[in-house]
Amino acid sequence: AYSAGRRADTAAEAAQMTRLYVVESTFTITGAAADHRLRAASSHISALAARFAAEVLAKLGKPAAFKVSGLKVSDEWVKECVADLVQAKGQALIVAGDHLSADAHRVVALANAALGAAVRYAAVPAVRAGTIADLAAKPAKTLVILGGNPAYDAPADVKFAAVAKAATKVVRLGFHGPAFDETSALAQSAGGTFIAASHYLESWSDGRTVDGTYVPVQPMIEPLFPSFTDLDVLAAFAGSTQEPYALVRETFATLAKTKSDDAFAAWLAEGVLAGSAYPTVVDLTLAVPSAAFAAPELSLEKLEVRLLPSAHAGDGLYANNGWLAEAPDPLSKTVWENVILVSPKLAAKLAIEPEAMVINKIGALNRNINQLVDGRLIAKIARLTVDGVSVTGPVFIMPGLADHTVGLQLGFGRKLGGRVATRVDERLAGRVTGNGFDVYPFLTTAHPAFRTGVTIELTGGTTPVCNMQDHWSMEGRDVVREGSVGDLEKNADFAKLGIDGHAPAVYGKDGAMSPALKATTTPRGNSAYEHPDHAVAPNLVAWKGHESELKIQQWGMSIDLNTCTGCNACVTACQSENNIPVVGRDQVLKGRNMHWIRLDRYFFDGREQAGNAIPEDPQVTFMGVACQHCETAPCETVCPANATVHDDQGLNTMAYNRCIGTRYCANNCPYKVRRFNFLDFNKRVDGHYYEGPLGPEKAVKDPADLPQLQRNPDVSVRMRGVMEKCTYCVQRIQEAKIQAKAAARDSGRTQVADGAIQVACQQACPAGAIEFGDITDPNSRVSKAKASTRSYGALTYLNTRPRTTYQAKLRNLNDKMPGALRLPLSRREMAGRESHAPAHGSGHAAPAAHGESAHK
């Protein structure tokens, strides 16, 4: 829904674009996408919600005086935001986070009702269930644990080990046995029974959505191992011998009031049972909360800790997933571990020097070079303490945090959990080297999301932090291009910066070509030379009469920065599709990660910074960068073995068996998107990379052959000494071409239809930010995206002529907001870049866009 409201190529479409305000304590991808963002401690947001609701109700003539105390926030920010909400009455909505208090949700519901927001509340049936606290008070004779891992992630005040040991019999259904799971190990120590659980993709089951709609769960594959589902176990306890499939059919027949095979098949195909949702609350009478909304005082001595699920491990469930462990956190870009996130102001109070990031944008660039050792980020270690409980971890300075809020990620510090979760290094006599630190000691039943009254102290130690992006700023370059809705209204070509804005007209007869066709046949810069036309097939005689249908299709991609949220789905989808290995923490610290897509994150401040100060309240933009499949690719000209060449479809291809590993191509690639297999990452596991070809058998082969089962048989598995990169999923292109030829039969119409090919990153993108297809077809979706006024190429002044282009980001700014700037902060940086260009070299300076002064 968010992405659908952010698509705009014309002034008329931009006028209908949604505007997003976000109030949060730590930086999230939602906050990064915001047009206006306010930093506030989590413990203050309930009071701030009451303040917002009171302002909304007062403006709409329904005053409600809520008791708010201790809240320090910009009155102007709140009033202008509320004025915008009221002006958009009927099309405005306030969403409260699930970690806020019940009273906060109540006042937000009141405000939404006054705004005319179409919010439906479902009447969820009451469930007869007790709590773990009830179990502690009255131990169960038989304790059945279905899934989860309460021995690891139960609230700290719940002594789950005591609960389990007090039971006469413990039955544990879980994915991992006692050697790899804390709860399974606890059940074993209590003399219990372990039952291997089936994955949901191997199971028949059913469930309810948030609004109560009845949905099926159906298996996609046969179970890999002998295992059982929740339904198997519950049915056995109930004395039933029915299979899960029969139980699901029985439940469906009860709810759908039919035993028809056709009705059941339709339910499986559609995925929902119409009319099965819980009834909505029609008369939503919400009493004005009588409770006072108090914002506690925060300081260096009384900090707030925000507890968040990890982008890598969730709450710990995915801690043993190597793809997620090595997928960078969207904002901090850390991998394989969690860190203590602190604000720049808090870091200054703790006398922690900023890392060696390029962070000063306007004025002279300053670096602090004392924090990097051999290219590694060295972080100071700190201890956090609350109510006598302490956790220790590395400190990471993060822009955009509330001043006295510390961010902690859950899901790390597992004592058991498998090769990835615990990183057992067999080279060190089986010693567990650690994978982050456990912060669950801070989580209690009364405080599931944040704690206040926390103290912090430096221990004096340091440790390397595994971080995939040390560079924070574009230094005023025009790699990522942004504009406001006002920019688009005044100048549709606002994204044409630098050489794009000053290149001469396309030569002669080619002036009427579509932008996509110009990109394939005409060099930039008014040259009279044209590349050879690859559109004529060599076997026209065999296809006489169908010459127009025999053009060799030219593939290209467009990425819309305005809808990209930086979620990392494309990174992991590419890794899954193309057999990209997980290399491990030690190799990432050496800069040897293998991802074909790099999701760059840039902070923009646009204000003069003193010394090496990190900006406290920046804007953020994400940019997905993979091989650009350049028309004039710099990598091709330097390869001595012709291992990377251009094919007639416009793809920059790799011949792996020709590659001799000189890495000249990686050196000459201006986008830095090529990856080199320094070791046999696909053949061996972490901890055995250096053992050589005669190493022990266990280093070569997984006992269950699971890695082999995971790999895509249509993609080559690369070995040591070979360079690799994005291929535009050439295996999917070939499959689509084969299917098109089979469907054509004698007609000769072998062109692949638009949309028939979805590359892995495009298919996984939840925002629909990626378009891929034939750029010589002016009616294809990718051609229309490239014809957008927001379309541009990265580093085009190098005459690489990339096949992948981008659509500039738009921010729908409210000019009345305090501190609002006419241009997005990245544009201010570009405009102010000349003040430090001489010190950094003028070879990559970007001229200002048409009609825009470089001095503001």
Per-range role (PLM):
Residues 699-707, 711, 721-856:
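Long, compositionally biased charged/polar accessory segments in the mid-to-C-terminal portions
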Residues 356-373, 686-707, 739:
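Surface-exposed intrinsically disordered loops and tails
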Residues 1-33, 118, 124-129, 133-224, ...:
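A cross-kingdom feature strongest in bacterial/archaeal respiratory oxidoreductases
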